[in-house]
Amino acid sequence: MEQIVTFGGITIDNVSPDHIQQLYSVKLNGTSNNEEIPTEFPNIIQSVCSCDKHVVELTMDVFKLVDTTENSSCAICRYQENEPCIEHKSSESNTKCPIAQSVSCSHSFHACCISRWLHTKKTCPLCNIEWQLIGANNDSVVIYFDDKNQEFKLSDNLVEDIGRQFGIDMDNYIVCKNKSPVTEYKNSTYALCTRDRHNSQNGQTNLKIICEFDSKTENLFIKYSTTIEELRKLVSQTFDLFKDQVKLIYNNIEISKDFDNLTVFNIGIKNDSNLAVECYKSFTYDMEITNNFMVLYVPDTFNTTNSSNNIQSVVSGSIAWIPQPFIDNVTNKDLRCLLSSLYILVKKVNLNTELIQSVTDRFEKYMELYGMHYRQIKLAKDSLRCLLEMNHFNNKDRMILSCTFYELIDRIQRDNNINKNPLLSSNLICNLILSDKQVNEQTKINWKFLAKDVRITKVFNIYSPLVLTNSVPPLLTLNKNLDVVVFTGKGKDVSLPIILYDTLTNSETDVNAAELGKIVSDKGDLMMVDDRIYEEAIMVCIDTSNSMSKASDFDEDIKLKRSSIIETKNRFYEILKTESHSSPQESDIRQLTNTIIWFITHPNFEDWYRKLYSQELIRSIACFEQKVYPNFAMMLVKYPWFFNKLLTSKKVVVNNTWYSFIRNESNSNYNETKYSKEPLQEFLCPISHEIMEHPVVAKDGFTYEKSNILKWFENKSTSPMTNEKISKKICDNKVLKSIIRDWKENNTVIEQSDKLSVTIKLPDPWNETVIHYNETDNIWDLIYQIYHITGLSHDQYKLTSNYWAIDKSSLIKQISSKIKIHPFEKKMVDVKICDKTYFFGTENTMTVSSFYTVGNLLYKLKSRKYHRYAVWYGLKDSGDGFQRGTILSPHDKLIDYSEMTLEIHSSNRYKTPKGNHLSRLDVVKKLFDAYINRSIAYSFNTAIGLMSFSDKSVLECAISPFYESFREKVNELDTSGATALYECLKDSIENLIEWKNADLENRSKAKLRIICLTDGKDTGLDKFKNTVKHKSQYHNVTIDCILIGSDYDNYLGKIGEKTNGYVFNPSTIKYALDIMELETMISSTNRKTIFYHNTIDEKTIPPIINPTKKLHAKAISPMEIISKTNENTKLSQKLIRVQREIVDVMKNQHPDIDVYINEQDISFWKIVFKGPDSTPYKNGTWLAYIQFTEEYPNIAPNIRFVTPIKHCNINNYGRVCHSILDRNYTPNVKISLILQCIYGLLLNPDVNDPLDTNLAMIYYDANGLYEAQIIDYVNKFALKSREEWNQELAKNQFKNW
């Protein structure tokens, strides 16, 4: 008897079930099987919904008839109750309608009106409460459950009462109204349903389960209605397992596959439940021996695919693919690669019998070449055939193929000294058996050549996610976990443009190609995913120098800025328009008095008094002070006569009261304090013979008033009493000070007067005094008296009472206790002043009081128009002729800046706010954002880098195809420094060259380009200019410049001209954004060589390369082309397909579309579109062309309009934006359908996905501007008739515009 063989060429002597189970540590069907975990659940909860039973039809039974009420009206028809209702009036009936009253809310209505209302509404039209049935209690609810109903009292324990009455666990049920869960109850009817029957939007009926697998814990959020099968699939995706491999255990009971159709609610899974997940690592196998070859495989119990023609059901996640027990070290990542590769293989043979035979034969030869057992070869070949034919492919075939592929790849790798998981190279073997190369039975495979063949043939290449947006599925690619998956199509959502199929979990996901490409590149080798053949590399250079903070100089900005300045200036000078008066109005007397006192007691009064032009001076003061003292400023311009009088005579009378700058202590309104007793001699200062306030003891042993002795010591060093030389040290006499204070309080005499009085503590050397005041006097009046007593200006001290600061607008009589003056420390400081308002500038040092402010300084140094000046400190050069520093507020104290040099500069207080215009850098950021958006939309094979420059150039983002995230970096840029323009251009050229040389295989033909966004004025080193010029020309680097602003370097334009670059200097933001939408700016690959000697103006559209010769070639009708085609002519696959499309277009001819085929080249068509009626295009006809490239039909044909057309989905170069040419294109799409879709754009433009955003933005405007622009283009370019086009194209008389 011949020996039994199995995988790996292993021979088996004994194939009894017990021996096989022991040999492979498996279980076989038909043998005893002791289950350790029970699989039957003790209680299955049945689903219940009672919603249809709780709905009770409302009828007139919920109302009772009552008598009419005078002056009451029906809430529905609004007629009086004692009048006929609207129905009776319309029928001209004179009978009165009965009045029906609700038993729920007691509101009354005409019976006819309420009967009609009940057909659609169940609530009262007045109070909106729900009507109840007669007999129902107001504090109860009726619950319907299954076939039962029960009335319950409304209470806090209602839910518990319901559960107790019906004998159910309320954790499994919810109370519903109209099939929606409720939490607040009122007098009504409700249904009791199980939680799986209704899913609320607020998540009330959803639940969280905690899944644990191999020390991993994940929270899954599902619905109660989720089936066990859906849960099993979700768990498999979460933990990366085969769905059939997932074992779910709940409460120590396995949820077997018998329960897959039940919901999680049915088996009692509750919120926050723990679910144990295990993996079937050992299965119950069937054993089958065919031609003495033994195979163990999982029975076809759960995934029967016999005779199925669905590829996803044939090649998808199933435990049958796991090659256990023969091979143990296979991971899910390995199996994904195998299944994805087989998916592509099945798709490529496409039920082609001849090709299937070729593939299986080659598979057989390679297995023989590497010495695999002939019985295994026979079985594996048959299994592969079943797979490719998708016919009778079962789990036994899955086991055979997974083991055989593993073994064949492993033998090839061992022969090449490769150490890698075999199944991760499944795509290489699939490519090998699909290729048409002859199998050399004498020479084994070179692994390097095998990998190279994959890249050459491209069928089983693992493609970059970035490539997929322009590729035809299916293709192998990587997901975010670097697993091999299959790109199966393009999504409907523009933001998620590709669909990936995970063969292991049998699931599809829509993803963003750019984001996925970035993730994959961050996790692995960039070259592994970036396998595109690049057409162009672009370095975007952004100017961030100081000059970029200036206004853009755009027309709209200039107008806005000018109008904003005028508006702000007018608002600033609005106060000067106030009408002046010679005598004060009654309501202004108090405020005018306050202003006069403020003016007199101002520390700069003497400076104002010395200056000429008092009228203009007063207006200047008003403008300068209006922000802080708006009331004083208003008085200055409203009553200028009073202040002119002060500036000429230093005194003025208001309301019969004189106010003077000249101090007159004898006439001041205050009295010295008097005492009932003579003070003791010890209380008097020996120097002044006055009662002491701050007694101090000197070294001579005598006590003096502190201020007096200090003044004595300024000029002398002897004792005032003994005339002997003494030390100047003194110390406080606190005991005497306390005794004097008590004596004053007990002996002060308050004289009777008609006026009110207040005690005020004056600073040294003045004594405490009593000041008299009138009933209406406020603190400003007190300040005036203090000025005349002490000469202190109003900003040299503060007033307090009981340690609280006093508001200057308060009435004096509101102060209940003694007022104390706290003078600010007065000392003189030197301040360096550099006045830059003069042509040559002046520098000097001023000695000013410590309480002097910036405003006081300007009042002292300038004669008028103080608001036109600003004081700065810390000014330093920051490049581009800019200086940076800190501008001081008029109220900043000069003492804080005594060690610095302050500079006075001219300044506009009414300048336009920054938010009212776009800075040049703001414009650049918007342009960059628009450029990135367009680059993503066009999906050219382009890599982009980002540099910024000010004092130096900085590489912000290296050249990469993952440029979508660059916007975040650009938004962070800010202005500073000079403009090292040419240094940045030099560094950009070097970066581009380095990028190109790093991968010549994919980048050698890539064009190199720089897009420079700048104001164009270089302030860096001139030595780089020639370097940039020579390097850019030598390495063919194109330099495009978009100049923002009115000043730029002409040398930059010359370099752009020499490199076939563009130089734009847009005058409006609209034109600037239009530039970024030019196709030749997005990619220069189709840019026509043309030299501009200056900046490109707004009306010029840079030309694109068109197939000129083919456009001018003779074209004939499809019928003539077909008749001329020679049946014996051999055509390529592309032209055969084109020929079919010609026939299809003839069969499906559109009435407004004419098709012409080039006589000498059927791959070039000319199309004439007639504008649809009832659209702005109705009077026009347009010529377009279709060019079928070599990649057709895998890639959509190139279609462009030749006749200029104004359309938001067609760009300036005639390129059409439609999903059928992009994400919705497949090789099966007919040209006739594409033409119909383009015609459909003329009928209904897609304004949500435009190429011309400006036109799309005005589409919905009712001003007719959208239609006017289109009609203007029609009249300029598209008035040629279809007959004229026919003659031109047939006679080869086509003319360009």
Curated annotation (Swiss-Prot):
Disulfide bonds: none annotated. Residues 1133-1279 form the UBC core domain. The keyword Metal-binding applies. CDD domains: RING-Ubox_WDSUB1-like (cd16655), UBCc_ApmR795-like (cd23833). It is an enzyme of class 2 (transferase). GO terms for molecular function: ATP binding; ubiquitin conjugating enzyme activity; zinc ion binding. Keywords: ATP-binding, Metal-binding, Nucleotide-binding, Transferase, Ubl conjugation pathway, Zinc, Zinc-finger. A zinc finger (RING-type) spans 74-128. Pathway: Protein modification; protein ubiquitination. It catalyses: S-ubiquitinyl-[E2 ubiquitin-conjugating enzyme]-L-cysteine + [acceptor protein]-L-lysine = [E2 ubiquitin-conjugating enzyme]-L-cysteine + N(6)-ubiquitinyl-[acceptor protein]-L-lysine; S-ubiquitinyl-[E1 ubiquitin-activating enzyme]-L-cysteine + [E2 ubiquitin-conjugating enzyme]-L-cysteine = [E1 ubiquitin-activating enzyme]-L-cysteine + S-ubiquitinyl-[E2 ubiquitin-conjugating enzyme]-L-cysteine. One of its GO terms (biological process) is protein ubiquitination. Residues 899-1082 form the VWFA domain. Residues 678-750 form the U-box domain. The active site is at 1217 (glycyl thioester intermediate). Its EC number is 2.3.2.27, 2.3.2.23. In the C-terminal section; belongs to the ubiquitin-conjugating enzyme family. The RING-type zinc finger domain mediates binding to an E2 ubiquitin-conjugating enzyme. Catalyzes the covalent attachment of ubiquitin to other proteins. Also acts as an E3 ubiquitin-protein ligase. This is Probable bifunctional E2/E3 enzyme R795. It comes from Acanthamoeba polyphaga mimivirus (APMV).
